[in-house]
Amino acid sequence: MNYTGFQSIADEFGFIVIYPQGTLLPATGQTHWNVGGWTTSSITDDVGFLNEVIDFLDDEYSINLKQIYSTGMSNGGYMSYKLACDLSSRIAAVVSVTGSMTVETVEGCNPSHPTSIAQIHGLEDSVVSYYGNAFSKPIEEVMDYWVDHNNCSSEPN
């Protein structure tokens, strides 16, 4: 969370930033967000947890529920996409940094509205391959999914 610089930006522009952490995945001994793929052994309901976090923030701070954004790096990027799919009624936009979408996320994705998406990814990423693998869709397919869902052009204007 320290490397994002979001706290100083939030302080300057008056918004709330939170840094939730996924739970420990026993199979790997690492923290994770349950997004399918390599996390299929997880029984954690991370979408439900983050939905409750949003409820808590609204109860405590009366947040603008139309301006909830998710960003994450690597597995956090996967989780941001999962939220855009499974909690779309509450998520305005997402940014994934070196994340992708698992096959399970794509197959279960049914967003209720067009969702702004940004993807930051290196072509030579050796952890989350830009070109996909057994767990992840290739980034171009992920972008094509959102272009189709959002009924927009992939060309900037």
Indicate residue ranges for each PLM-predicted region.
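Surface-exposed patches in mature extracellular/periplasmic domains of secreted proteins
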Residues: 65-70, 153-157
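Structured loop/turn residues at beta-strand edges in well-structured enzyme cores
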Residues: 63-66, 89-92, 113
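Conserved G/P- and acidic residue-centered "switch" motifs that form tight phosphate/ATP-binding loops
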Residues: 72, 76, 125
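Proline-centered helix-kink/hinge sites
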Residues: 20, 88, 114-116
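Short beta-strand immediately N-terminal to the catalytic nucleophile in serine-hydrolase-like folds
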Residues: 70-72, 97
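Serine-hydrolase catalytic machinery in alpha/beta-hydrolase-like enzymes
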Residues: 1-69, 78-86, 108
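The feature captures the conserved acid-bearing segment of alpha/beta-hydrolase catalytic domains
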Residues: 92-157
